[in-house]
């Protein structure tokens, strides 16, 4: 391809400020003419011949001035600016907390390229027209495999897991703090939204509930302990349709987790069940709560009630727990699910969940009537969900 001569604009004051010297325009033009650059004082530009491919901008013209003026004549100056003590930003401290939790669960950090292939969307079964397919194309890519900027961290995570699986590593847990790049529109008219996403991936020992437990540990460390639900309604084509959930708080999606769709696993040559989770780090930082208040050792005994509930299979445990949390009042101290049953003793489309609920008062020993009143309130609210005590 034939190269055409170009004109590079110059500014005498900027060149002098850049070099820290005081040279006149006439002297600069003389220097440029000595190397076959043709200055035009009227247009304030320099005509650059085709064989000078190294002259592209003002800094390149300044370099020519510096060479002829003499590097030894340029005065030395100390860097100027304010000296600060420094510190760790809020976002960085959040990331460090997350790393500490994840690594305690046996995960190792990985780093993958932000550039990837458009074929990744097909491997992930992402539908045509999906927002994730609106990726920024690289103007000078190394090749088609690195020609777009990623919009999801899953391709890099699954590729890393696949590499480990093909090297016969039997039990692998990886995580990555991965930036994704989401353009408002294409072609670009302004900078894309750059979001940091936490991607978790594992195969081998562990299942969906192990991954969910790791996510819960992260949320707990950040003080995000109430109002979090797991709703199996997210439209994630790359996840198993019956083993996935959106992580919700205040009707806002914090992320998602689930088992990788079998077809997607085959596309990445993963011959075993694989589990992933993706969390929006910015939203975690926004929801984090470190307002921890000291509570003294309880002076009065707790009262525990175990209940077994029967309901339709479509009712979520999160819905049950939300009712317990909201109806338990000040006496509610803790609750946990300890049994799930499906079988002959309940209906075909029903299931049974058993909860242990603990109550305690700060100023007195609870009587049976106190606890019964709260339990009646909880059970009455559960009736609105079609939930009843198991007989």
Regions found by a protein language model. Give the residues of each.
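A glycine-rich phosphate-binding loop feature that marks nucleotide/adenosyl-phosphate handling sites
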Residues: 1-7, 45-51, 79-84, 112-125, ...
């Amino acid at each position: 391809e034939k190269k055409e001569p170009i004109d590079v604009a110059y500014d005498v004051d900027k060149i002098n400020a850049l070099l820290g010297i005081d040279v006149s325009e006439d002297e600069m033009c003389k220097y440029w003419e000595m190397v076959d650059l043709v200055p035009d004082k009227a247009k304030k530009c320099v005509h650059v011949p085709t064989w000078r491919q190294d002259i592209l901008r003002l800094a390149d013209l300044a370099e020519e001035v510096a060479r002829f003026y003499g590097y030894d004549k340029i005065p030395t100056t100390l860097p100027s600016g304010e000296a600060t003590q420094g510190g760790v930003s809020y976002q960085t401290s959040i990331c460090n907390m997350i790393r500490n939790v994840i690594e305690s669960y046996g995960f190792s950090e990985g780093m993958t390229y932000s550039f990837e292939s458009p074929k990744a969307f097909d491997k992930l079964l992402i539908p045509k027209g999906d927002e994730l397919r609106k990726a920024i194309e690289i103007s000078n890519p190394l090749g088609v495999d690195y020609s777009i900027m990623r919009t999801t961290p899953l391709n890099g995570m699954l590729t890393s897991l696949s590499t480990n699986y093909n090297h016969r590593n039997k039990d692998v847990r990886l995580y990555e703090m991965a930036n994704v790049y989401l353009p408002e529109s294409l072609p670009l008219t302004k900078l894309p939204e750059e979001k940091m996403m936490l991607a978790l991936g594992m195969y081998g020992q562990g299942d969906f509930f192990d991954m969910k437990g790791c996510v819960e540990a992260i949320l707990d460390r950040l003080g995000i302990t109430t109002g979090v639900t797991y709703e199996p309604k997210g439209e994630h084509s790359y996840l198993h349709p019956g083993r996935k959930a959106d992580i919700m708080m205040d009707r806002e999606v914090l992320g998602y987790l689930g088992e990788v769709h079998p077809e997607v696993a085959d596309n990445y040559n993963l011959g075993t069940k694989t589990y992933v989770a993706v969390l929006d780090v910015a939203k975690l930082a926004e929801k984090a709560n470190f307002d921890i208040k000291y509570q003294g050792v309880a002076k009065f005994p707790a009262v525990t009630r175990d209940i077994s509930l029967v309901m339709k299979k479509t009712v979520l445990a999160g819905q049950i727990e939300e009712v317990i949390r909201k109806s338990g009042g000040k006496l509610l101290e803790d609750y946990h699910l300890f049994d799930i049953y499906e079988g002959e003793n309940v209906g075909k489309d029903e299931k049974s969940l058993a909860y242990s609920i603990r109550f305690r008062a700060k100023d007195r020993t609870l009587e049976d009537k106190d606890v019964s009143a709260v339990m009646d309130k909880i059970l009455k609210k559960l009736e609105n969900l079609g939930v009843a005590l198991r007989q």
